[in-house]
Amino acid sequence: MEKGNQSTVNKFFLSGLTEQPELQLPLFLLFLGIYLLTVLGNLGMIILILLSSYLHTPMYFFLSSLSFIDFCQSTVITPKMLVKFVREKNEISYPECITQLCFFVIFAVSESYMLAAMAYDRYVAICSPLLYSSIMSQHKCLSLVLGVYILGIVCASAHVGCIFRIDFCKSDLINHYFCDLISILNLSCSNIFVNDLVILIFSLINTIFPTLTILSSYAFIIISILRIKSTEGRSKAFSTCSSHISAVAIFYISAGFTYLNPSSSHSMDEGKVSSIFYTIIVPMLNPLIYSLRNKDVKIALKKMIE
């Protein structure tokens, strides 16, 4: 056999969510609607923050960065998935598949660390309010966001680099609605021990470190809030964190369920369902969560409309 995966497979076919013909149109309309809401919600949030001087704070700088990640993540995945609902075969070239995988990993990992950075920002704001401006300087915020993307790129480079060392000859049908890493590896006829090891290591790192950052930040936040004597003060402090906690819970539960399961016992159908949450649903929900439960965003939106 010739070496190099492009010598055996030049293109793949995505199986999509379901093969049932009666569900294709309803699912197409459903996910098209979700994608449009995602684009409008996240771009709207970015524009609102850019145009409202009232929101030019570190908290909303991170929120605009999260919205950008969600917009990109959804755009990387959803349009190609929609093709399957209107065409019998959803073909994707090998380079296009690897590119989709690369950007998917970049934005998925970046979102994980961005949520951690946002938790750290809330910790500083509530636990050290007098030092907040000096600690969360513009340089510090830019460095954190840059670090988030660097971590995403490093992780994606490791996975894509490992993909290039294996051959594909079992099948050209990816049992997923996008070029998911585990689904691609299931088509390999090479030894994928190294790939599985890299997945396990990076999954643990990208789950444990952000989770520890978030949990430790909120542990200190809760302690600080409990020291606040006034009920109004406690309520205000909790309200600034509730939206972030909701976003964190949805993202980590769905992502962890997918990638911390051993591949040998992993059900691809279950994987598709959990993947829908963090690749399609979460990017749509985040701007809704942060706008509906955030007084500052509501005020800025009201001022812009008026």
From Swiss-Prot:
It is a multi-pass membrane protein. The chain crosses the membrane at residues 29-49, 57-77, 98-118, 144-164, 197-217, 237-257, 272-292. GO terms for cellular component: membrane; plasma membrane. GO terms for biological process: G protein-coupled receptor signaling pathway; sensory perception of smell. InterPro entries: GPCR_Rhodpsn (IPR000276), GPCR_Rhodpsn_7TM (IPR017452), Olfact_rcpt (IPR000725). Keywords: Cell membrane, G-protein coupled receptor, Glycoprotein, Membrane, Olfaction, Receptor, Sensory transduction, Transducer, Transmembrane, Transmembrane helix. Pfam families: 7tm_4. Residues 1-28, 78-97, 165-196, 258-271 are extracellular. It is found in: Cell membrane. Its main location: membrane. Glycans are attached at residue 5. GO terms for molecular function: G protein-coupled receptor activity; olfactory receptor activity. Residues 50-56, 119-143, 218-236, 293-306 are cytoplasmic. Odorant receptor. Belongs to the G-protein coupled receptor 1 family. This is Olfactory receptor 8G17. It comes from Mus musculus. The gene is Or8g17.
